[in-house]
A protein has these predicted regions:
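Conserved alpha/beta-domain cores
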Residues: 1-170
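Acidic, divalent-metal-coordinating active-site segment for phosphoryl/phosphodiester hydrolysis
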Residues: 169-177
Length: 177
């Protein structure tokens, strides 16, 4: 969506927005902060993050939902300005082991979470996953339930974790269940 559409949404009460592309998101964030500083919007980066774009994301976004490598987490922490609160992050889990998707395997989660939780300018808030598309209710629910179970175990180790972000429009109803 362009800035005008987002402005209309913000005036209607939507205050959190997700962006897939770092440059496009940063342009929108800068525009809002310059032209509408009265709006206190929350910006989530939800796309794959390349190392060469980490600084712009660390300097502008409030959340990164796609942390899947320690190198990216370390860069985000090092590049987060001291005058901003710690960057909220979610670790992306590839629950269906899809070759075409980003994210770590559930087995890799403990090691990455332990390392991310120690980074000073990041706040580990939880997990994110985009399950494989499925036609049936059961097919949609299987990876969502696996993620819910993984998140429950994750919260035992990280009680501050309060966010589980899952699914897309096609499985929204099932993800909310």
């Amino acid at each position: 969506f362009n800035q005008d559409a987002l402005l209309e949404c913000a005036r209607a009460g939507t205050l959190a927005f997700g962006e897939n592309y770092a440059q496009e998101g940063c342009t929108k964030i800068d525009w809002f902060r310059t032209n509408h500083p009265e709006l206190h919007l929350e910006w989530h980066f939800i796309g794959p993050l390349q190392a060469n774009k980490s600084r712009m994301v660390a300097e502008r976004f409030d959340w990164v939902q796609t942390v899947d490598r320690l190198r990216i987490a370390e860069r985000l922490s090092a590049q987060r300005p001291d005058n901003l609160p710690p960057l909220n992050v979610l670790i992306e889990v590839n629950v269906d082991a899809e070759a075409s998707k980003s994210g770590i395997s559930p087995e890799e989660l403990p090691a990455l979470a332990a390392a991310v939780s120690k980074l000073p300018r990041l706040r580990l808030r939880g997990l994110m996953s985009i399950p494989a598309p499925a036609e049936t209710y059961e097919g949609k629910m299987k990876p969502l339930l696996a993620m819910a179970s993984l998140f429950k175990a994750f919260q035992e180790k990280y009680p501050q974790a309060d966010t589980l972000s899952m699914g897309m429009s096609a499985d929204l109803t099932e993800a909310v269940e």
